Amino acid sequence: MEMELDSEGRMVVRPLLTDLYQATMALGYWRAGRACEAAEFELFFRHCPFGGSFALSAGLQDCMRFLRAFRLRDADVQFLASVLPPDTDPAFFEHLRALDCSGVTVRALPEGSLAFPGVPLLQVSGPLLLVQLLETPLLCLVSYASLVATNAARLRLIAGPDKKLLEMGLRRAQGPDGGFTASIYSYLGGFDSSSNTLAGQLRGVPVAGTLAHSFVTSFSGSEVPPDPMLAPASSEGPTVDLPARVNLWLKRVCLYLGLEEQEPHPGERAAFVAYALAFPRAFQGLLDSYSVRRSGLPNFLAVALALGELGYRAVGVRLDSGDLLQQAKEIRGIFRTAGAQFQMPWLESVPIAVSNNIDESELMRLAQKGSEVNVIGIGTSVVTCPKQPSMGCVYKLVSVGGQPRIKLTEDPEKQTLPGSKAAFRFLGPDGSLLLDLLQLAEEPPPKAGQELRVWPRGTQEPCTVKPAQVEPLLRLYLQQGQLCEPLPSLDESRRFAQQSLSLLRPAHKQLQSPAVYPVALSEKLRALVDSLSARGPL
């Protein structure tokens, strides 16, 4: 898709990023005289993704930006006129030209919130024709963002708090927009950085990266740097011929490792020297272009030790093939002994980064106790979400003209919850999460310490709950087209997501066969559902 940027340098989603049937329904509403009827839709999901027990809500900021800028251009209206019946009343197209979101109100979960099945991520109210047109773009903006954020959060739970996670999936993503979105929301979900420089430029995602095998293999060893001299890190003292110092160190390193001096690949060494001259304060080596043990490691050590003499410290190595866990263990052992042998103790703590199509199961290995891996680069498994490539969000009508609406189907789990609703989160005395409650908006809010009878979804029996704390979940972000409160930054949403995840009970954080987090209905909402299920919609 053509990338169009707004005044803040962010990508624009246009109103015609939608399904044709939204336009045909809009014409139907207009012909029926119902275009301006008050209506409310809810955007939610029915099942937690990846077989888990939670999701993270994401994409709200993108939704607000889309809604505030919503306007059909002349070219948009002309295209719709070309695909709708030729005898369509021109007044309908004039109605479309005049549309904006000045009559739209949105309540939503804050970005980065824990979300559970059936609880609205967004509540969108306004004129029926308009809020119907918003369905597909809002689903597009929320579903993938929430899926990637949830996937990233799961990977962060596996990795634990100490491992650095680098998202590096841009080249594996489903197109440039998918790659850009994944970089943003994997960061929100708990990754530390991304390789995607556009995400860094436009959304402030920290960027990181190393070097590729192409850089290493492009050198043969015969290259002579135009300027081989390097000044000490302190800027005091004479400059040093770095390639010459590296060759001297190589002799000592090979003797120490029991290698012939000819074994380490000269082209690889030349590549490392070139990189070190360009980045003396950020030198890192990719060790597996030829042989980790016989070439990559000794070449890296020779360059790192030569830099160390000048007061610089290498910042890491990366492995991209083989048994990553075992190799990292062996390399760490050599770093420890080499640091002592050559009196450069900082070598012992040089970070070891790994990549190579890492998925959840491999991440579990790399994160196990005693692992010497420090940084884990994940691409395909975070951006494509292979375990579940779609969030399954839906956007359903819940009221028209102030009257509740319900969808009754042959599949009971696809039945909707009618009416305008409020949502609350109940917490226990220790601050852990107990359940989420859905009730009609007209009901008084529940209070802490108040015993309530509620109906957990998926059960036929009520239960009694007495929360120590009650938190309203849905906040008013857009009222009559006006933003009601400043939207948090990406970093603030990321911190909020991590804080929210910390409140989940361990049983709900399990990635395999987790306990189901309960979502319950108030007695009044349950009674309305039963009534409409028996009688059909009002």
From Swiss-Prot:
Q: Where does 5-phospho-alpha-D-ribose 1-diphosphate bind?
A: 380
Q: Describe cofactor binding as the record notes it.
A: Activity is highest with Mn(2+).
Please list the GO terms describing molecular function. Answer: metal ion binding; nicotinate phosphoribosyltransferase activity; transferase activity
Identify the SUPFAM superfamilies for this entry: Nicotinate/Quinolinate PRTase C-terminal domain-like, Nicotinate/Quinolinate PRTase N-terminal domain-like
Q: Which branch of life, at top level?
A: Eukaryota
Q: Which GO terms describe its cellular component?
A: cytosol
Q: Does the keyword Translocase apply?
A: no
The reaction(s) catalysed by this protein are: nicotinate + 5-phospho-alpha-D-ribose 1-diphosphate + ATP + H2O = nicotinate beta-D-ribonucleotide + ADP + phosphate + diphosphate
| Modifications after synthesis and translation | Transiently phosphorylated on a His residue during the reaction cycle. Phosphorylation strongly increases the affinity for substrates and increases the rate of nicotinate D-ribonucleotide production. Dephosphorylation regenerates the low-affinity form of the enzyme, leading to product release.
Enzyme class of the recorded protein, top EC level: ligase
The family annotation for this protein states: Belongs to the NAPRTase family.
Protein known as: Nicotinate phosphoribosyltransferase
